[in-house]
Amino acid sequence: MQIPFSVYWIPLDVQFTDKPSLKDPVMIAAWPGMGFLAKISADYLRRRIKAKQFAEIKYFHNVLVYKNGIVEMAPIKHKLYASEDQNLIICVGDAQPSVPEESLRLAQKISDIAVEMGVKRIYTMAAFPNEFYDEPKVYGVFTDESMRDELIETGVEMIENDGAVNGLNGVMIGVAK
């Protein structure tokens, strides 16, 4: 009989395949959520600007997969892409951790990589349930007043009510702040 173990003891595996040449890049991070909107948008952006993968983070989800009756741990991948032309890093994940502690651990690892790459600003993407509008809108929450004012000038609308940012998006904002 095997002794149960905690996935928290398994280190997050980061593999770099390249070190892009960037100067104070911006990072956009996205994970699947409502309607996969953020992941689809980030994947579209990375393809559109021809960003190249330079790293991958793997961690294990609390799900086992099986094939022909044999189970194995299912790694979840978060790929990091860079566009030197746009001075941009895009982090796209296959899934969000289902355990809050794992969200914190993953957000810290992404933040560590961002710091190592010289990133000063991280934007996360997520869908926001709202009424249908003919013209799409972009809503945001901000880590400080100066960022709020700057982004409102670009057309980002502030979410007016109090609320919460759930999942990895909220944790990433908190860790990066």
Label every PLM stretch briefly.
Residues 33-40, 101-105, 163, 167, ...:
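Conserved active-site and cofactor/substrate-binding residues in soluble primary-metabolism enzymes
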Residues 31-32, 94-101, 154-163:
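Flexible, glycine/proline-enriched loop segments at strand-loop-helix junctions
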Residues 99-148:
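Internal, conserved structured core segments that host functional sites
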Residues 48-49, 117, 154:
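Residues at alpha-helix termini
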Residues 2-95:
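N-terminal short beta-loop-beta anion/metal-coordinating cradle
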Residues 131-177:
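Catalytic cores of processing enzymes, dominated by hydrolases/peptidases
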Residues 39-46, 111, 169-176:
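Predominant activation on well-ordered alpha-helical scaffold segments within soluble catalytic domains
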